[in-house]
């Protein structure tokens, strides 16, 4: 596929300050923003996901916010298809992909793997095997992948065997092959802050969420969706549901949300650092205006 177009990725951990920079850059480039956040796709989940408010958009068009009900599953595959449809149908426009869900961003910039979807009949057969029989099959079909899996991890072992039974090819080989379904070249930008400052921003943001009415938001959603809301496993919602169900105190919920958010930020940082194509900017060492100016220049000189 010929590379004809360019787009920018603005990534980084939760609370780092992606929103302000992306808005300023979008205005400078006359660009549209594609939200790349696995939680902001859900309608009604506003405060807890730090969803951008209408007045904060400053007239910039945003995509993939509030597109599905919380009862519906929205996967990385859905995201990849939706984003590529937007990109490929509007190739003359400038786009910023902004968010912290690394798996989602990677599916667009590098493509999705060609591994087959789960097969019900194959899964039913594999559940009849005991652990030793399953392990022996996995070693037979794909020794390389199996050696990286704990012998008692049935889920991963079943997947190794399933892929071979469905395709006749090894999981370890197929998982390295991706299909990229767009003709865009991506300038990958990642934002960071010194850890102490980032964690302080996260803690303060959680306090603001509670002041804005997070508890009431979750209560209202829980009345509508019940445990289906809990199954989304979104930080800020599960903790409040536990509070609603008297499993923890409100103070404990606040503490857990802050702790889980900090842990999530650490995982995000690790994910993006592993991708060497990202160019990093530390917001504690350079102004937002300088970062926007630099990204603008990079975008216009990159072939």
Swiss-Prot record:
A GO term for molecular function: ATP binding
Q: Name the cofactor(s) required for activity, per the record.
A: Mg(2+)
The record's keywords, sorted A to Z, are: ATP-binding, Magnesium, Nucleotide-binding, Transferase, tRNA processing
What the entry lists under Gene3D superfamilies is as follows:
1.10.20.140, P-loop containing nucleotide triphosphate hydrolases
Residues annotated for substrate binding in this entry: 14-19
GO BP terms, alphabetized: tRNA modification
What NCBIfam families would the database entry show? miaA
Q: How does it assemble?
A: Monomer.
Q: State what this protein does.
A: Catalyzes the transfer of a dimethylallyl group onto the adenine at position 37 in tRNAs that read codons beginning with uridine, leading to the formation of N6-(dimethylallyl)adenosine (i(6)A).
**Protein name, please?**
tRNA dimethylallyltransferase
Instruction: Supply the source organism for this entry.
Output: Fusobacterium nucleatum subsp. nucleatum (strain ATCC 25586 / DSM 15643 / BCRC 10681 / CIP 101130 / JCM 8532 / KCTC 2640 / LMG 13131 / VPI 4355)
């Amino acid at each position: 596929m010929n590379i004809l177009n360019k787009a920018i990725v603005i990534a980084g951990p939760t609370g780092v300050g992606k929103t302000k920079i992306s808005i300023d850059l979008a205005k400078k480039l006359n660009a549209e923003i594609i939200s790349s956040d696995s939680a902001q796709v859900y309608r009604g989940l506003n405060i807890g996901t730090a969803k951008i408010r209408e007045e904060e958009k400053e007239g910039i068009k945003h995509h993939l916010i509030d597109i599905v009900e919380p009862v519906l599953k929205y996967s990385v595959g859905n995201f990849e298809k939706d984003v590529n449809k937007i990109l490929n149908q509007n190739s003359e426009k400038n786009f910023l992909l902004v968010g912290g869900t690394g798996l989602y961003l990677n599916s667009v910039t590098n493509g999705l793997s060609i591994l087959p979807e789960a097969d019900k009949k194959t899964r039913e057969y594999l559940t009849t095997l005991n652990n030793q029989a399953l392990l022996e099959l996995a070693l037979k079909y794909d020794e390389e992948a199996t050696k990286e899996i704990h012998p008692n991890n049935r889920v991963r072992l079943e997947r190794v065997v399933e892929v071979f039974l469905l395709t006749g090819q090894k999981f370890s080989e197929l998982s390295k092959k991706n299909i990229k379904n767009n003709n865009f070249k991506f300038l990958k930008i990642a934002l960071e802050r010194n850890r102490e400052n980032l964690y302080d921003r996260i803690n303060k943001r959680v306090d603001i969420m509670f002041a804005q009415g997070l508890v009431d938001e979750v209560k209202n959603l829980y009345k509508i969706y019940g445990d289906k809301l809990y199954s989304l496993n979104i930080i800020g919602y599960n903790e409040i549901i536990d509070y609603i169900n008297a499993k923890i105190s409100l103070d404990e919920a606040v503490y857990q949300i802050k702790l889980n958010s900090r842990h999530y930020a650490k995982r995000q940082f690790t994910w993006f650092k592993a991708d060497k194509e990202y160019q990093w900017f530390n917001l504690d060492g350079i102004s937002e205006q300088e970062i926007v100016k630099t990204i603008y220049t990079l975008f216009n000189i990159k072939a």
